[in-house]
Amino acid sequence: MAPTIRKSHPLLKIINGSFIDLPTPANISAWWNFGSLLGVCLIAQIATGLFLAMHYTADTSLAFSSVAHICRDVNNGWLLRNLHANGASFFFICIYFHIGRGLYYGSYLYKETWNIGVILLFLVMATAFVGYVLPWGQMSFWGATVITNLLSAAPYIGPDLVQWIWGGFSVDNSTLTRFFTFHFILPFIIAAASMIHLLFLHQTGSSNPTGLNSNLDKVSFHPYFSYKDLLGFVIMLGALASLSTFAPNLLGDPDNFTPANPLVTPPHIKPEWYFLFAYAILRSIPNKLGGVLALLLSIMVLFLMPIIHTSKLRSLMFRPIAKTFFWALIANTAILTWIGGQPVEDPFITIGQIASGLYFLIFVLLIPSLGLLENKLLKI
């Protein structure tokens, strides 16, 4: 019998091994849907972004009016812009669920896959940050000024580094031009890194909710999980379309409807909601360099996860004490997100400092010690 083309063709057999005949644990839940949802988000962002880039002008005197032109004069431009802006929010919702799933079910024990995933998170955050600057509204300008200024905290090279990134002595035309360049190229770098992420994942296969070896119980990815993922796509794209059409500015900042003005500072400078937890950690330390290091460590702490895993059990499914503290971490991150959007005054300063301390305490101290405690209690 002649071999099936999808199994013999050099290109098709890669696709076949990744999306069709891929052996997948039969018991993976909807939490395993977010990886493919992130792929859909990336494709949607690149597609909408490409059309927006055709009409956008990366110049300080024209950027704001070019975005207004897209929304007013370009056919369905308002929809493209709203899908792109809200698509970023959905991207981060999916990425945070995806990381949460990885932490809960011990997916970080696939070290290479996990580490590339954390690098991907940094890349997505960088892309979102430079993208937020492009409409050249008040929050775009002042957000760029505040965040890039943090690099001046780096000893010795700091001030030169900031001027090098700005391309001058302040956030200006050259900054906007290079930020647009970065915003255009980074999604393609993310796409390439995602392929490496998948390559390493397929070396080991997916984990499953129990954290046990699933070689005894695997099914082909298609049709079982391709259709299950398709349901997730419909739900997410439906929610994105609803948000983008009925409440497109719900997650945005009203200050960004005012053109950038270097002479007027907005009353509260804050990033988009998905960066607020890290922003709260940054603000909770009164020292500039300390704040910047805490900001970096709030994400880099994820690199430690494979090292500080001390439990003999992989998943939190069978670890009731650790499970409690996992949900405490989620609640704590939600509190940090809320604090990041509040003004810098009491009691918000104190709450932010306590929540920031707890964030690192749970990661660095409680996760490894609870693993050892549970091993002792289970006598393993």
UniProtKB/Swiss-Prot annotation:
Heme b b562 binds at H84, H183. Coiled coil: none annotated. It is a multi-pass membrane protein. One of its GO terms (cellular component) is mitochondrial inner membrane. Heme b b566 binds at H98, H197. GO terms for molecular function: metal ion binding; ubiquinol-cytochrome-c reductase activity. Signal peptide: none annotated. It comes from the Eukaryota. One of its GO terms (biological process) is mitochondrial electron transport, ubiquinol to cytochrome c. Keywords: Electron transport, Heme, Iron, Membrane, Metal-binding, Mitochondrion, Mitochondrion inner membrane, Respiratory chain, Transmembrane, Transmembrane helix, Transport, Ubiquinone. It holds the Pfam family Cytochrome_B. Binds 2 heme b groups non-covalently. Its cofactor is heme b. Its main location: mitochondrion. A ubiquinone binds at H202. It is found in: Mitochondrion inner membrane. Belongs to the cytochrome b family. Heme 1 (or BL or b562) is low-potential and absorbs at about 562 nm, and heme 2 (or BH or b566) is high-potential and absorbs at about 566 nm. Component of the ubiquinol-cytochrome c reductase complex (complex III or cytochrome b-c1 complex) that is part of the mitochondrial respiratory chain. The b-c1 complex mediates electron transfer from ubiquinol to cytochrome c. Contributes to the generation of a proton gradient across the mitochondrial membrane that is then used for ATP synthesis. The cytochrome bc1 complex contains 3 respiratory subunits (MT-CYB, CYC1 and UQCRFS1), 2 core proteins (UQCRC1 and UQCRC2) and probably 6 low-molecular weight proteins. This is Cytochrome b.
